[in-house]
Design a protein with these regions (language model features):
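Active-site loop-to-helix "anion-binding N-cap" substructures in soluble metabolic enzymes
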Residues: 1-167
C-alpha cells in the first residue's frame, strides 16, 4: 500500500498510476435512512469522481465507511451499509458487491467494486487498533482517504491504516 506525499503535499488520485491497482477508499456513506430507504444521496454522489477514476483505470475498488453510531463489534441491521451498496449499484449501473464478513479475507475479482459492511461493526475501529489497521492495509495497493467529514477521527479506517502503509 502507498501513502503518497511529495514535498509535504498530498498527491491526488489523478496523479498516480492506478492501472489495475487494488484501491481501498475510505468514503463517507453515513447517509440518512427512512424505513430502510436512503433519503438523501448527497454523500453517495460525492464519491462518484473517485469511483469513476478507479473504473477508468480498471482498478479493483474496496469501499469502507461507517454509518451511524452502532455499538462497536456488534451488528445492528439499522446501521448496515447493504442498502447503500444496492443504491450505488443502481446509480453507477455497475454491480457493487456487498461484503458483510471481510476480516478473514475475501476474493476480489479484477475490476470489481465492493462495499464492506459498516466499519464500526468491527472491533478496534474507534480505538484505532493495530490489528484492524493492518487488516485494512493488507487489502490494497493504494489507500485513498475520501471521507473529509471523518478525516479528523483517529480511527483504524481513517488514521491507523495509513500508519501501516508503505511511504
Amino acid at each position: 500500500m502507498k501513502c503518497v506525499h511529495q514535498n509535504d503535499r498530498i498527491v491526488k488520485m489523478s496523479e498516480l498510476n492506478l492501472t489495475k491497482k487494488k484501491l481501498l477508499i475510505r468514503v463517507d456513506l453515513n447517509v440518512p435512512l427512512s424505513e430502510g430507504k436512503i433519503s438523501s444521496d448527497k454523500r453517495i454522489r460525492a464519491i462518484l469522481p473517485a469511483l469513476k477514476l478507479g473504473i477508468e483505470n480498471k482498478c479493483s475498488i474496496i469501499l469502507i465507511s461507517h454509518m451511524g453510531r452502532p455499538k462497536e463489534g456488534q451488528f445492528d441491521k439499522q446501521y448496515s451499509l447493504k442498502p447503500v451498496a444496492e443504491y450505488i449499484t443502481q446509480l453507477i449501473q455497475k454491480e457493487v458487491r456487498f461484503i458483510s464478513e471481510w476480516a478473514d479475507g475475501f476474493d476480489l475479482i479484477e475490476g470489481e467494486i465492493v462495499l464492506l459492511e459498516n466499519i464500526r461493526f468491527s472491533e478496534g475501529e474507534k480505538d484505532n487498533s493495530d490489528n484492524l489497521s493492518k487488516k485494512l492495509a493488507d487489502l490494497c495497493d493504494i489507500f485513498v482517504m475520501d471521507a473529509f467529514g471523518s478525516a479528523h477521527r483517529k480511527h483504524a479506517s481513517t488514521y491507523g491504516v495509513i500508519e501501516f502503509s508503505e511511504t
